[in-house]
């Protein structure tokens, strides 16, 4: 009998339920159904109440922050920064209010009015309507008050834009005189609306931005633009309000009274924490981001992997946080397992498979990272490997001339004599670290040979931070007056360039701080060289250190910068390179951490030598 027939037979012979049983079943079903309906209704009510509560909370938070900003916008506290240099025929009162959840690019609302209060109210009402309608949780609010405005035709604008490096035009643009379509500087640069190469506004990027922001795109670009500047204020997630700098060199980021020891420690902690978060399960890093459009950098460089390890160990030294240890170990293991090649039992190199290259600098920074790790953790775990890598460096050094060979291929065949001056300093720094690790004179002798070449070839001209690091390390063991003079010259003769540099140029700070440690060592040891009296300007040197410590904050992703990127939370509280599309890359962060770490370690001495007094005299 088929399965179907058996089932039919079973059904045919099944006992039919009574009327009472049917009624009971029906009653039970009704009760269950009613309970389900009630549960659904209750869930809907709860969700509604929760949603309404969240909406009320979001509105209350917005109103609190907005009121704090309103007080600033309507006050006269910064009247000296508001020149009133606004071209006739343009609105005198324009306020921009930016709101951001931290999860997406900020929304910006523009208000104009007969007075400042009316302009504020216009921007505020637009923003509040958005918060209500979208149930939007704005953790950051930023207010900008227009202080200057001038009309340029497109030819004049192109001429003006020609003078700026990418992302360094620090003015907003209105595309009509009534400011119906007005874009802040941070929006222009954050959404790539300015085409610096062709010195114009990119209509495609502009309209894409306007559409995504829910604003009307332009049918065509006008024949003239209103270029404007603002005075700004930032209210953060803790309802703290910061004045934003209006000077062009440091435009748009919060004013910091003094970049002191505690402030530097916080920068190092935050940025190193960012690096920790970039370590993947296999020990490699997320290499970097172009945050304007939240895009990963599709590349990897094992040399930068190695140098970044150094920053992770710095954070451990500062915090003693044991949770960092497995992350650091994982990142070192990745380097050791994937990028170390042996030439023989005595010689190893750091090898980059992608390019099939052995780079001198890579071997150098690998040694620095491993020795830093062993020193921080009181371990000799990587001693043998560090020595083998050091022997690899020696195969690339002509100790008679002090010159290095920079690049070998994967078969250990010479490929390129010179790649970058950085490699020389990195390798020499590593040799000095190996001497510290082993007390074997062969490392120090090799480092001396390289330093003699630095001096004879006048490496001062390269403004190289790795040379400064290597000089700082070797003068711990060698009291040669020529070494000290060269090290001081490496900073002094480049101070004008460093002091006046418009970009953050993070490696300059490392150069300065390494040189400061050398200077301090001279004073502590009572070492005097003629250059101290005839060339070295301590006041200018210390003033430059503070100037760079402060100016480099323009490369830090405070909320007021991050909020105009596509995914603010992903790059918050780390360092970036503005003139390369706000690039965030592990080595950029590492160099910033390196400079601020040394600043933190030496801050008390810097103050004792008069840094803050010299700063105030500038």
Residue ranges and their predicted role:
Residues 124-185, 480-553:
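Active-site/pore-lining binding-face segments in mid-to-C-terminal subdomains
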Residues 73, 217, 267-284, 326-346, ...:
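Long, well-ordered core segments of solenoidal/helical folds
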Residues 256, 291-306, 347-363, 379, ...:
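Solvent-exposed loop and edge beta-strand segments that line ligand/cofactor-binding
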Residues 247-261, 306-322, 365-379, 426-439, ...:
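Well-ordered alpha-helical scaffold segments within catalytic/enzyme domains
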Residues 300, 479-482, 500-618:
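CBM-like carbohydrate-recognition segments
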């Amino acid at each position: 009998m088929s399965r179907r027939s058996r089932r039919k037979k079973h059904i045919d012979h099944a006992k039919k339920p009574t009327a009472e049983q049917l009624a009971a079943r029906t009653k039970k079903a009704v009760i269950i159904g009613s309970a389900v309906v009630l549960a659904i209704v209750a869930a809907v009510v709860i969700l509604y109440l929760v949603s309404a509560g969240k909406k009320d909370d979001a509105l209350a938070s917005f109103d609190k922050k907005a009121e704090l900003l309103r007080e600033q916008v309507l006050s006269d506290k910064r009247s000296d920064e508001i020149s009133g240099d606004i071209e006739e025929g343009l609105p005198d009162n324009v306020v921009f209010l930016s709101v951001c959840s931290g999860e997406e690019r900020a929304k910006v609302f523009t208000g104009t009015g007969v007075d400042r209060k009316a302009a504020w109210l216009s921007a505020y009402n637009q923003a509040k309507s958005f918060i209500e309608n979208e149930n939007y949780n704005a953790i950051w609010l930023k207010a900008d008050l227009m202080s200057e405005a001038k009309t340029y035709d497109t030819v004049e604008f192109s001429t003006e834009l020609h003078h700026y490096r990418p992302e360094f035009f620090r003015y907003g643009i209105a595309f009509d005189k009534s400011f119906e379509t007005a874009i802040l500087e941070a929006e222009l640069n954050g959404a790539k609306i300015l085409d610096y190469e062709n010195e114009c506004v990119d209509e495609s990027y502009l309209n894409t931005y306007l559409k995504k922001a829910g604003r009307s795109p332009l049918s065509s670009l006008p024949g003239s633009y209103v270029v404007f500047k603002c005075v700004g204020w930032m209210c953060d997630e803790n309802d703290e309000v910061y004045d934003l700098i209006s000077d062009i060199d440091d435009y748009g980021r919060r004013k910091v009274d003094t970049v002191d020891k505690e402030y530097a420690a916080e920068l190092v902690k935050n940025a190193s924490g960012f690096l920790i978060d970039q370590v993947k399960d296999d020990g490699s890093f997320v290499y970097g981001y172009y945050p304007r459009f939240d895009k990963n950098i599709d590349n990897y460089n094992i040399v930068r992997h190695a140098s970044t390890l150094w920053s992770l160990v710095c954070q451990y030294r500062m915090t003693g946080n044991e949770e960092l240890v497995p992350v650091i170990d994982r990142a070192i293991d990745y380097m050791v397992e994937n990028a170390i090649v042996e030439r023989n039992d005595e010689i190893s190199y750091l090898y980059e498979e992608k390019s099939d290259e052995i780079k001198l600098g890579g071997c150098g920074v690998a040694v620095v990272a491993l020795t830093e790790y062993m020193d921080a953790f009181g371990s000799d775990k990587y001693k043998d490997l560090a020595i083998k890598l050091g022997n690899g460096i020696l195969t690339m050094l002509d100790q008679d001339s002090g010159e290095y060979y920079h690049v070998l291929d994967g078969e250990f065949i010479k490929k390129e004599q010179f790649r970058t001056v950085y490699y020389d300093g990195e390798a020499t720094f590593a040799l000095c670290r190996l001497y510290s690790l082993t007390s074997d004179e062969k490392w120090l002798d090799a480092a001396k040979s390289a330093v003699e070449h630095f001096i004879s070839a006048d490496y001062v001209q390269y403004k190289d931070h790795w040379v400064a690091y290597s000089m700082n390390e070797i003068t711990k063991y060698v009291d040669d007056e020529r070494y000290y003079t060269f090290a001081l010259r490496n900073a002094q003769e480049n101070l004008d360039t460093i002091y006046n540099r418009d970009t953050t140029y993070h490696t300059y700070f490392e150069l300065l701080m390494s040189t400061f440690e050398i200077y301090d060592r001279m004073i502590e040891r009572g070492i005097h060289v003629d250059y101290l009296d005839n060339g070295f300007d301590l006041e200018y040197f210390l003033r430059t250190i503070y100037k760079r410590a402060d100016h480099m904050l323009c490369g830090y992703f405070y909320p007021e910068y991050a909020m105009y990127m596509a995914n603010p939370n992903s790059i918050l509280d780390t360092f970036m390179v503005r003139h390369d599309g706000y690039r965030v890359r592990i080595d950029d962060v590492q160099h910033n951490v390196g400079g601020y770490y040394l600043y933190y370690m030496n801050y008390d001495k810097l103050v004792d030598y008069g840094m803050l007094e010299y700063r105030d005299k500038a």
